């Protein structure tokens, strides 16, 4: 019933109008799993390779026909007859067949799409929801929780065409008692932020992740606008809603000069100065989580940041760790950061993703499940967050169907699981329990 009889891939379009890989895995019992690979804009240099065609006459070089050749050729051939419910074995076949450190032969986009489609097919064969199957694969069968959302309501950096250097300003509805209530609070703040920005004569156009993308005089001005919106929605900042930021600092790091050039504010910082700048923002506003607060290569700076802020704040490594257990292990050993951002396509398979989550949790780090700026209607990360009881999720704002698809899937899961999947709110954030 769970043997693979067919694997196929196709080229579909993501939320930025670029092609991506979608895969289907068909089993002998008539079960089918389908999944699509996401794509990032601000990417870590050590991420698994996303294979693009480079043919400028087609999709401006962004086509994925080479990756599809791998899916429909060697990957499909190698997986025929294999048991889809043995996810680790399926992923290992593809990893071995690719044979490179960073999946550059077939592309992480090819391997990941098949890996996730296989997980969905395996869940169907077992007659269970994907989150339940993931919990079993994770060795935590029956252990679920609903994640605290980090909602990216002001976009900057590589995710927007504005002058704001910091990439994401997020809210966390920590006063909510359920995930459903958290979504409502987030939506109400989002709509009030639109009113606040309009009243200031600012743009309410949205960026890649559905947050507003106005030009602002400073990064602090973004936080001030969110504070105003939270209060206008009838909530108290710091009690009902907390703040989080993704600096994506690698995007404004000047490697030659070794400093951080925030062109939007006209300021240049050393690593140490930028850490104190972040500390100052966290003293002014109830920021509880900072992601990629320095360049991915600035490990000495990250060590200082962790020592300076890590007892009070969640210090999240995204480009820093790229969902890679080898790099994460080094970070744990050196006491760098205290949390990891989890992105499937940074590593390229479900099995390796689960290994990174487990390593983080075993070391006392938190794991934040995340989308990418280039997304599709695929909502697998919702099931991943619940099935691993990760506790936190980043999946954009309260607009754009590519973001809302994940929130809606989480609402369905909460309805199905009820009390079996508690919503723990702020307790899930490192340093806030």
Swiss-Prot record:
Q: What residue ranges carry the coiled-coil annotation?
A: none
Sequence positions that bind Mg(2+): 246, 291, 318
Q: Name one GO molecular function term.
A: magnesium ion binding
* Domain of life, per lineage: Bacteria
* Residues annotated to bind (2R)-2-phosphoglycerate: 167, 343, 372-373, 394
Alphabetical GO biological process terms = glycolytic process
Predominant place of localization: cytoplasm
Q: Which reaction does it catalyse?
A: (2R)-2-phosphoglycerate = phosphoenolpyruvate + H2O
Give the UniProt subcellular location, in the record's own words: Cytoplasm; Secreted; Cell surface
Stated EC number for the protein is 4.2.1.11
Q: Which UniProt keywords apply?
A: Cytoplasm, Glycolysis, Lyase, Magnesium, Metal-binding, Secreted
- A Pfam family (short name) is Enolase_N
InterPro entries assigned to the protein according to its UniProt record, in alphabetical order: Enolase, Enolase-like_C_sf, Enolase-like_N, Enolase_C, Enolase_CS, Enolase_N
Pathway per the UniProt entry: Carbohydrate degradation; glycolysis; pyruvate from D-glyceraldehyde 3-phosphate: step 4/5
List the active-site residues: 209, 343
What does the entry list under GO cellular component?
cell surface; extracellular region; phosphopyruvate hydratase complex
Q: How is the cofactor bound?
A: Binds a second Mg(2+) ion via substrate during catalysis.
What is its cofactor? Answer: Mg(2+)
Q: How does it assemble?
A: Component of the RNA degradosome, a multiprotein complex involved in RNA processing and mRNA degradation.
Protein task? Catalyzes the reversible conversion of 2-phosphoglycerate (2-PG) into phosphoenolpyruvate (PEP). It is essential for the degradation of carbohydrates via glycolysis.
Family membership, please give it.
Belongs to the enolase family.
Q: What is this protein's record name?
A: Enolase
State the species of origin: Photobacterium profundum (strain SS9)
Q: Which gene encodes it?
A: eno
């Amino acid at each position: 019933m769970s043997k693979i009889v067919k694997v196929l891939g196709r080229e579909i379009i993501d939320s930025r109008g670029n092609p991506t890989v979608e895969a289907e895995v068909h089993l002998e019992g008539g079960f089918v799993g389908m999944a699509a690979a996401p794509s990032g804009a601000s990417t870590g240099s050590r991420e698994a390779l996303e294979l693009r065609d480079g043919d400028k006459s087609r999709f401006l070089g962004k086509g994925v026909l080479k990756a599809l050749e791998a899916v429909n050729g060697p990957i499909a051939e190698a997986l025929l007859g294999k048991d889809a419910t043995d996810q680790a074995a399926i992923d290992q076949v593809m990893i071995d067949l690719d044979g490179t450190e960073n999946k550059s032969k077939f592309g992480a986009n090819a391997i990941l799409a098949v890996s996730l489609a296989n997980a969905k097919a395996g869940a169907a064969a077992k007659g269970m929801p994907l989150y339940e199957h993931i919990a079993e694969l994770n060795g935590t069968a029956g252990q679920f929780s609903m994640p605290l959302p980090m909602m990216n309501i002001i976009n900057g950096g590589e995710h927007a065409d504005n002058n704001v250097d910091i990439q994401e300003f997020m809210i966390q509805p920590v006063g909510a008692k359920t995930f459903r209530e958290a979504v409502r609070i987030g939506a109400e703040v989002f709509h009030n932020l639109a009113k606040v920005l309009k009243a200031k004569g600012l743009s309410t156009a949205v960026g890649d992740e559905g947050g507003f993308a106005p030009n602002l005089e400073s990064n602090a001005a973004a936080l001030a606008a969110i504070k105003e919106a939270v209060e206008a929605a009838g909530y108290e900042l710091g009690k009902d809603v907390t703040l989080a930021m993704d600096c994506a600092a690698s995007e404004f790091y000047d490697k030659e000069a070794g400093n951080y050039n925030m062109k939007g504010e006209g300021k240049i910082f050393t690593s140490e100065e930028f850490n104190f700048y972040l500390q100052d923002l966290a003293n002014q506003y109830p920021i509880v989580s900072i992601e990629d607060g320095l360049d991915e290569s600035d490990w000495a700076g990250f060590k200082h940041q962790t020592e300076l802020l890590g007892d009070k704040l969640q210090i999240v490594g995204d480009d820093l760790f790229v969902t890679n257990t080898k790099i994460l292990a080094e970070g744990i050993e050196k006491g760098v950061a205290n949390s990891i951002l989890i992105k499937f396509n940074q590593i390229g398979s479900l099995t390796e993703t689960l290994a990174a989550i487990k390593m983080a949790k075993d070391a006392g780090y938190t794991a934040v499940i995340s989308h990418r700026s280039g997304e599709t209607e695929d909502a697998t990360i919702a099931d991943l967050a619940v099935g691993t009881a990760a506790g936190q999720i980043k999946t954009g704002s309260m607009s754009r169907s590519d973001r809302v698809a994940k929130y809606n899937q989480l609402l369905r899961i909460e309805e199905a699981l009820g009390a079996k999947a508690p919503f723990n709110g702020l307790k899930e954030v490192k340093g806030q329990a």
